[in-house]
Design a protein with these regions (language model features):
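N-terminal accessory/interface modules of nucleic-acid-binding and processing proteins
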Residues: 1-253
Length: 254
């Protein structure tokens, strides 16, 4: 892409339906090429899986927001793991600093129309401590599977990312053979390259990054349910989380 969507004026429909997904694909691709992405392992195979919570809902972000936000966190060097929209931040007693840009994402309303919003980290607010203090009280998801560990066994994007996202949400350790991580990179790269093409030049045989993240998020829910059952974690708690999270999970990024 030779244009910056955040500097080039475009129609709202084009911005929502094309620029944001393409930007996400660009961020993913650059991260993989530099071997610097939140879901990639270090030389020992260890992956630092950390949740990022939506202060409004109290839950870890779904995949289509979580990973783009994690990329932004890595790039900007933020320490906080709580984000919120501009209006929600106002409700927490502070405001977004002038000139700060959030992480854009798309969602569909009940009528099917695509809208755009953005999320900001605590460090991007005028009073980060007040925001974090008040937002933390709303966080419902804790590291209920802390102490559990998983080794990613598949290089298929849905399975690989699904396992990583499950670790972020469940608070458990995750690792992978670096060679398998390389296989994952080679399998998801065609999708990223396809998403960066003009809309009418894209292959319909390849899934979009948005669809992969959507399926990976569903897979993470299945993994968490399976681990919870085998580990004896309160199933009522797990079901409540799934029910509360369902609407947000279904908001695909297009």
């Amino acid at each position: 892409m030779d244009k910056n969507p955040f500097e080039t004026p475009v129609a709202k429909k084009e911005f929502n339906g094309y620029w944001i997904p393409s930007h996400n694909a660009k961020v993913f691709k650059e991260g993989l090429e530099k071997n610097k992405a939140p879901f990639l392992p270090n030389e020992k195979g260890e992956i630092k899986a950390e949740p990022v919570y939506n202060a409004s809902s109290g839950y870890c972000l779904p995949a289509n927001r979580l990973i783009p936000v994690q990329f932004a966190k890595m790039e900007k060097g933020f320490d906080s793991n709580i984000v919120a929209g501009r209006t929600a931040i106002g409700g927490f007693g502070t405001s977004v600093k002038e000139g700060e840009k959030g992480v854009f994402y798309n969602f569909r309303d009940e009528d099917g129309a695509i809208h755009t919003s953005s999320l900001f980290f605590a460090e991007q607010t005028e009073n980060p401590e007040i925001f974090k203090e008040q937002a933390f009280e709303k966080i419902k998801t804790r590291n209920n599977l802390n102490g559990y560990s998983m080794v990613i066994g598949s290089s298929e994007p849905k399975e690989y990312l699904g396992s990583y996202i499950a670790a972020c949400k469940g608070g458990f350790d995750v690792s992978v053979d670096p060679a398998l991580a390389d296989e994952f990179k080679s399998k998801i790269m065609p999708t990223l390259e396809n998403d960066l093409k003009k809309h009418d030049e894209r292959s319909k045989d390849l899934p979009s990054l948005s669809n992969i993240l959507f399926e990976a998020d569903k897979r993470s829910t299945e993994i968490l349910k399976s681990i919870s059952q085998s580990s004896g974690v309160d199933q009522d708690q797990t079901q409540k989380k799934a029910k509360s999270h369902k609407k947000e999970d279904m908001e695909m990024c297009f």
